[in-house]
Design a protein with these regions (language model features):
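Conserved MFS/SLC helix-loop-helix module at the cytosolic interface between two early adjacent transmembrane helices
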Residues: 68-107
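Helix-breaking motifs and short loop linkers at transmembrane-helix boundaries and internal kinks
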Residues: 49, 81, 101-107, 136, ...
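Flexible cytoplasmic inter-helical loops of multi-pass small-molecule transporters
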Residues: 2, 189-213, 398-403
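C-terminal transmembrane helical hairpin of 12-TM major facilitator-type secondary transporters
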Residues: 282-328
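Interfacial helix-cap and linker-helix signal at transmembrane-aqueous boundaries
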Residues: 44-45, 76-77, 160-168, 246-247, ...
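Extracytoplasmic gate region of multi-pass secondary transporters
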Residues: 38, 218-270
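Helix-loop-helix hairpin linking two adjacent transmembrane segments in secondary transporters
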Residues: 137, 145-196
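Cytoplasmic helix-loop-helix junction between adjacent transmembrane helices
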Residues: 110-152
């Protein structure tokens, strides 16, 4: 039995509007706080006298634990539903941030970071399946709104955290948002309805495995996941090294470089909201390909530009690639069979987050070989490949998947 609903409802207003707002605010906090740690690393490194390798390892812990939660969360979605998982994510993430307050050693900082990665890892798969089944008529716009809110959080919260840290210390910057996580947990519980289709029992293990294997042989899913992985690979590398590149190679101050990174997320937020509307009108595959193609020139231009204004404009425009996220998420989730949707989506997210996280490693190796400029050309080439893949995506026809 399908869980799809809302075939003819409005994106805003009513119960669906309240649900969309609560999920968007939650993602604003979850994604934004994931980029606060990198922003505060210089301060944390000074306190604990860390090497760059140790500081980088802290970020690795955050993303690895986040990726590790994607599959088990997807499995849980098919059994307990999104409501409980979204609330648990907000509660656990808030508790993890409190752990930073009582972390006198770097080892405990790593523990807190791992806990935060685990807590935030519950949010993504649950958010995806909830939006897909609730906003069938406005799927692209709904995903764009929520992921756009996350991009605003990624732009705003790191900047705010550095201001708080300068006055009150980095621990205060981490725990300042804990009350907001608590409030979001309450609102999510009130606005997200439980599933009414027997989700709590879930399909049998053997049947789930068979459905997963069948899903991963679907050409649409293979192409979509490949394109998504290539785009995420570039995004991870870009956000990890844009500030370093602008500071070391283009000789901008770290403050200016950090502001350009924030500009990237602002452009990403705007393009995500607009991309969803365009896809709802012109189709997902053509829109995805167009976004990927438009994302190539900024990557090619960066190594060939000088001057603060030019670098600020082009560096910010690299955020256009972020609008691929909500569209490809909607395409993949909407293609998966209903009865294993959460499980399959969680497994796929674990896969492309794990592979995509290697982008920063590859670019880091190239940078140490004095090939920093060439790294951006590599990212541009991979983005072109993603565009070609998106052009071959068939129109989506939702399978029922349930009997």
């Amino acid at each position: 039995m399908s869980t799809r609903s809302g075939a003819n409802g409005s994106l805003v207003g009513g119960s669906r509007g309240r649900l969309l707002l609560s999920v968007a605010v939650g993602w604003f906090l979850v994604l934004g706080m994931r980029f606060v740690l990198p922003a505060l690393l210089p301060t944390i490194s000074n306190e604990f006298d860390l090497t760059e390798a140790s500081a980088g390892f802290a970020v690795t812990v955050l993303w690895v634990t986040y990726a590790a939660m994607q599959f088990p969360t997807g499995l849980a979605v098919d059994r307990v539903g999104e409501r409980l998982l979204l609330v648990a994510s907000a509660v656990l993430s808030g508790l993890a941030l409190l752990t930073y307050w009582v972390a006198p050693t770097f080892t405990l900082v790593l523990v807190a970071t791992g806990l935060f990665g685990l807590g935030t890892g519950l949010y993504g798969p649950s958010r995806g399946t909830l939006l897909s089944r609730t906003f069938t008529d406005r799927e692209g716009a709904a995903f764009g709104t929520v992921l756009g809110a996350g991009s605003v959080g990624a732009a705003a919260l790191p900047l705010l955290a550095t201001l708080v840290a300068a006055v009150y210390g980095w621990r205060a910057a981490m725990v300042a948002v804990v009350p907001l996580f608590a409030l979001v947990a309450i609102v999510l519980w009130m606005t997200v309805p439980p599933r009414d289709d027997g989700t709590h029992e879930g399909p049998g293990v053997r049947r789930t495995v068979r459905r997963l294997v069948a899903s991963f042989h679907d050409r649409r899913i293979v192409l979509a996941v490949t394109g998504a992985t290539l785009m995420l690979f570039g995004f991870q590398a870009l956000t990890a090294f844009l500030v370093t590149y602008l500071h070391q190679v283009k000789h901008l101050s770290t403050g200016t470089a950090g502001a350009i990174l924030s500009g990237l997320f602002v452009v990403g937020a705007l393009s995500q909201a607009g991309g969803g509307l365009v896809a709802d009108r012109f189709g997902q595959s053509r829109t995805l390909a167009a976004i990927a193609i438009v994302s190539v020139p900024p990557l090619l231009a960066l190594p060939n530009l000088d001057g603060r204004l030019a670098l600020a404009v082009v560096g910010s425009l690299t955020g256009v690639r972020m609008s691929v996220g909500p569209l490809i998420n909607a395409y993949i989730v909407g293609t998966l069979p209903d009865d294993v949707e959460g499980t399959a989506w969680g497994l796929l997210r674990t896969g492309f987050f794990a592979i995509g996280s290697l982008g920063s490693t590859v670019v880091g190796v190239l940078a140490t070989m004095a090939l920093f400029d060439e790294a951006f050309y590599l990212l541009a080439a991979l983005t072109v490949l993603a565009a070609v893949i998106f052009l071959t995506l068939p129109a989506r026809a939702r399978p029922s998947g349930a009997s």
